[in-house]
Each structure stands twice: as structure tokens, then as C-alpha cells.
Amino acid sequence: MDRKLDEFIGDATPKKVSKEKPVRRKKRLKPTSLDSFLPEEHINYFRDLRIGSKKIRNAKIEEL
């Protein structure tokens, strides 16, 4: 541990500059409408309750 700071910096490898393609980001999912998944009865039921789609997703649907 008698090394000086300059010796540590000198041993470091320089960053490589790559000319490869940039990393592609994951595509985001398009927002979907719950109308295409739920029956009309359930859609009307939740609209009457005036609750958001997150609560609709987590709700347990019981017999009307």
C-alpha cells in the first residue's frame, strides 16, 4: 500500500470508444382499453362506481 495516486491512475485502462449500434431500448406497451376485455355489464358497473382502471384491474368481479 505504498503506491501513489499517480500509479493507480496510470494503471487504469482508458474507456473504449465503440462505433457499434446504440443499445435499443425496450418498446413500451401501447395503452389498451378495458372495453375490449370486459363484458358490457362489467364496464357499466365500474363506470357507475366511478373508479379508475387500476382499481378495476385489481377488483374481484362478483355476480351482479
From Swiss-Prot:
It comes from the Archaea. Coiled coil: none annotated. Signal peptide: none annotated. A motif (PIP motif) lies at residues 31-38. InterPro entries: PCNA-interact_regulator (IPR053615). Interacts with PCNA via a non-canonical PIP (PCNA-interacting peptide) motif. Can bind both Pcn1 and Pcn2. Binds to the DNA polymerase sliding clamp (PCNA) and dissociates the PCNA trimeric ring, leading to the inhibition of PCNA-dependent activities. In vitro, inhibits the PCNA-dependent activities of DNA polymerase PolB and of flap endonuclease 1 (FEN-1). This is PCNA-inhibitor. It comes from Thermococcus kodakarensis (strain ATCC BAA-918 / JCM 12380 / KOD1) (Pyrococcus kodakaraensis (strain KOD1)).
